[in-house]
A protein has these predicted regions:
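Terminal RNA-binding accessory module
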Residues: 1-63
Length: 63
């Protein structure tokens, strides 16, 4: 798991995501929902590579 600070809303391949960075500066996108937003910190389980240099993750918990 990674702790990710959500920094911006983006659209990738027609889907809405929040994009942020982990403490190690890894760029992570999580699907946009009403449960969290920009400036929230999430515990994220990485699922796959979404684009070069961007991982896709699933929210485990809002911290």
């Amino acid at each position: 798991t990674l702790e990710v600070l959500l920094e911006e809303e983006v659209e990738i391949d027609g889907k809405a995501y929040y994009l942020g960075h982990s403490r190690e500066y890894v760029k992570v996108a999580v699907p946009k929902t009403e449960k969290y937003g920009v400036n929230d910190i999430l515990a994220v389980k990485v699922e796959k590579t979404l684009q070069p240099h961007i991982l896709q993750g699933e929210e485990i918990q809002v911290l």
